[in-house]
Amino acid sequence: MPEIIGKLLKSDGKVVSEIEKQVSQALIDLETNDDVQSQLKELYIVGVKEVELGNKSAIIIYVPVPQLKAFHKIHPALVRELEKKFGGRDILILAKRRILPKPQRGSKARPQKQKRPRSRTLTAVHDAWLDELVYPAEVVGRRIRVKLDGKKVYKVHLDKSHQTNVGHKIGVFASVYRKLTGKDVTFEFPDPIF
């Protein structure tokens, strides 16, 4: 049986960290708030991770994939309140996604019960995390620049209309994405062509 601690649902045998307890308690406290009370009642989280970014830190809250849309509805109010509670640390909400290994070929291959779904591939999970990381901004374009030494730099173009909302956080987005995936990414707000 999964263990339920406040708003946190942990799978069997997993130890609950102190930051997870704090975020779970903060979500319970926010349920009494009028802004998000009705929507937050049905929602829960499955994990919390704190990422150190030089002199700052960010808190990544993992939620179940089916509940991600519901979290997006209350995202601005929820993030604002949680950032107040945690002393200005940046709060990011991501879906907990699983990456399945590539099926092996040749003599090492084991028979598979079913084909690996596209949503469980490394590329699909990394792309989905990128979209969730910059929410409420929208990714309008992506470019991959391969340098002469073979290193790849990902350029992500965000919607110019959201620059005031998330413009100050793009350094945090890049650092967290590098920690999660190992990919260097830069965010830009290009002017619309048309």
Curated annotation (Swiss-Prot):
Keyword vocabulary terms for this entry: Ribonucleoprotein, Ribosomal protein
GO terms, molecular function: structural constituent of ribosome
Cellular component, GO annotation: cytosolic small ribosomal subunit; small-subunit processome
Name of the gene this protein is made from: rps-7
Key word Transferase present: no
InterPro entries named in the record: Ribosomal_eS7 (IPR000554), Ribosomal_eS7_CS (IPR047861)
Pfam family, one: Ribosomal_S7e
Protein name as annotated: Small ribosomal subunit protein eS7
GO BP terms: ribosomal small subunit biogenesis; rRNA processing; translation
Family membership: Belongs to the eukaryotic ribosomal protein eS7 family.
